[in-house]
Amino acid sequence: MIVSKSIKAAAHNLSKACNALNFSEPVTHVYNPLEYAWAAHEQYISRAANGKKKVVFLGMNPGPFGMAQTGVPFGEVSAVRDWIGINAPISKPENEHPKRPIEGLTYARSEVSGRRLWGLFAERFDSADAFFTDHFIVNHCPLVFMEETGKNRTPDKLPNDEAAPLMEICDTHLRKVIEILEPEWLIAIGEFAEKRALAASGEIDVRIGKILHPSPASPAANRGWAEQASAQLKKLGVWH
């Protein structure tokens, strides 16, 4: 319980610090699911971060069809609702984009990355609780950035004067999560996450690895992502 309480406090501090930042065009809308979906995120932490971990998986930031809707990293609706068991009410962001409405756990569109990631874990582990015994998933950045058209803009596309303070805040949070959970492994999901893992870890005693990002925008990920990710984790010695 002390561990989950500490992770919740770290997430709250991250959210508050990110809310103090400003972003300019082409970004017109910024969602912070740690605010409007806090009840679901808090439920996720209570379920997933109830003790020390062997492995922490690191994502980049929420997807508009995943965590933006559910408050859970890579939060494909059916996985969050049916496998993890999240049922908390989810409200709406203050400045909602008309093309990116937040519908929470009733959202009909499936997030492919989340379906692939949580699907792999559901195949390997008997239950979400079994997975969370040694594993936790966290995003580096909690914010979702959108352009006027509704197009998603990832943090790596932000200008440096906006990205630098954001990265500093998010790196600090990541270090805090690692200090609290004391994992043996920090596994980056994709290249951006790997860069942030390396930048943030510094003097912290944690081994860093990387797996292929499950995004459908990646041709490699569309050729049997689960098999490739499992093989990468086994090669690292994370899984056996």
Residue ranges and their predicted role:
Residues 2-185, 194-195, 219, 228-240:
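A polyanion-binding, active-site-adjacent surface
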Residues 191, 214:
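Active-site metal-binding loops of divalent metal-dependent hydrolases
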Residues 197-203:
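Short, aromatic/basic amphipathic alpha-helical patches
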Residues 204-213:
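Short hydrophobic/aromatic-enriched beta-strand-loop microsegments
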